[in-house]
Amino acid sequence: MQLSIRMQAVADMVTPGGKVADVGTDHGYVPIYLIEQNKAFHAIAMDVRKGPLARAGENIVRFGCSGRIETRLSDGLERLEPNEADTVIIAGMGGLLTVRILEAGLEVLK
């Protein structure tokens, strides 16, 4: 999996070996890359829109990551439980939306 320079920079910041939640996953490429590179042993790909989440699911299957990446329809962090992820990725969104997601998900992030 080849990532864009921007998404590669995001993936490079992930501490290896944990569980990753990708908020606003869109195509699912970052969690797929992290699984392929063994930087994560499990990932949750989340998106608020059904269409992008369906495409992410198709990509997850196509790249052979079905057993290690699950998809969730979620507005921000609302479908993530405490301790389900060591790392949360929120990338490609505006600052105000990112702040709203973080504020709404404070209990999950503690």
What are these regions (language model features)?
Residues 96-105:
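A short, conserved alpha-helix within the catalytic core of class I
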Residues 2-18:
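Conserved alpha-helix/loop element of class I SAM-dependent methyltransferases that forms part
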Residues 17-26:
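Conserved class I S-adenosyl-L-methionine
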Residues 49-51:
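Conserved SAM/SAH-binding beta-strand->alpha-helix loop
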Residues 54-83:
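S-adenosyl-L-methionine
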Residues 85-92:
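Short SAM/SAH-binding signature in class I
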Residues 42-47:
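Conserved SAM-binding motif I beta-strand of class I
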Residues 28, 32:
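Glycine-rich SAM-binding Motif I of class I
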